[in-house]
Amino acid sequence: MLRLLLALNLFPSIQVTGNKILVKQSPMLVAYDNAVNLSCKYSYNLFSREFRASLHKGLDSAVEVCVVYGNYSQQLQVYSKTGFNCDGKLGNESVTFYLQNLYVNQTDIYFCKIEVMYPPPYLDNEKSNGTIIHVKGKHLCPSPLFPGPSKPFWVLVVVGGVLACYSLLVTVAFIIFWVRSKRSRLLHSDYMNMTPRRPGPTRKHYQPYAPPRDFAAYRS
């Protein structure tokens, strides 16, 4: 932007000298909503003459933005060979260029050029002072009642949902493992705490009682 401001001092308005046309422009314009109107005022009578008015972009005027060609008695031809959306209108000692759909990176200095094509002699203007067109970005304010969620918000929602599902699966798996482990410990504990049982009383087999014999009595 500083370079463009310095350019205004490098290209002062040129006064009419013999076969030159004086062209004046506004020093600076701001393009709101990506559109701007630039008027090129000249001090030359173009009535009944065929002329060509063009708008150029850059300090070296390398880009021809828009062209208005014709005369007062015929319909003007307006065109752009560089992709700009432009229109033109011929007024009283002025040509107005209407530029639309401008981009922020098209902020630059623009120069008007007026040429008398017919009848001879050919006339044009010295380089004018130029106009800096500052294209401001279009900011859309969200509705306060129904604000539209931004893309990062949905990304966070999706990531949060995935993490929640993962946490739920891990929790369920842990609970299942814990229940099974607890059941296994209980079964093992019951087995270890079982007291050994003594075998039941066995039935004793008694010999039938027989009184002892006194063999001495038999001897006597």
Curated annotation (Swiss-Prot):
The modification Phosphotyrosine is found at Y191, Y209. It comes from the Eukaryota. Residues 1-18 form the signal peptide. Residues 19-152 are extracellular. One of its GO terms (biological process) is cell surface receptor signaling pathway. Disulfide bonds join C40-C112, C66-C86. GO terms for molecular function: coreceptor activity; identical protein binding; protein kinase binding. Keywords: Cell membrane, Disease variant, Disulfide bond, Glycoprotein, Immunoglobulin domain, Membrane, Phosphoprotein, Receptor, Signal, Transmembrane, Transmembrane helix. Residues 180-220 are cytoplasmic. It is found in: Cell membrane. The modification Phosphoserine is found at S189. GO terms for cellular component: cell surface; cytosol; external side of plasma membrane; immunological synapse; plasma membrane; protein complex involved in cell adhesion. The keyword tRNA-binding does not apply. The chain crosses the membrane at residues 153-179. Residues 28-137 form the Ig-like V-type domain. Phosphorylated by LCK. Dephosphorylated by PTPN11. Residues 198-220 are annotated as: Disordered. It is a single-pass type I membrane protein. Pfam families: V-set_2. Its main location: membrane. Receptor that plays a role in T-cell activation, proliferation, survival and the maintenance of immune homeostasis. Functions not only as an amplifier of TCR signals but delivers unique signals that control intracellular biochemical events that alter the gene expression program of T-cells. Stimulation upon engagement of its cognate ligands CD80 or CD86 increases proliferation and expression of various cytokines in particular IL2 production in both CD4(+) and CD8(+) T-cell subsets. It is linked to Immunodeficiency 123 with HPV-related verrucosis: An autosomal recessive immunologic disorder characterized by susceptibility to human papilloma virus (HPV) infections and the development of HPV-related common verrucosis in the first decade of life. In some patients with HPV2 infection, warts may progress to severe generalized hyperkeratotic cutaneous papillomatosis with cutaneous horns ('tree-man' phenotype). In patients with HPV4 infection, warts remains stable and may even regress with age. This is T-cell-specific surface glycoprotein CD28. It comes from Homo sapiens (Human). The lineage of its organism: Eukaryota, Metazoa, Chordata, Craniata, Vertebrata.
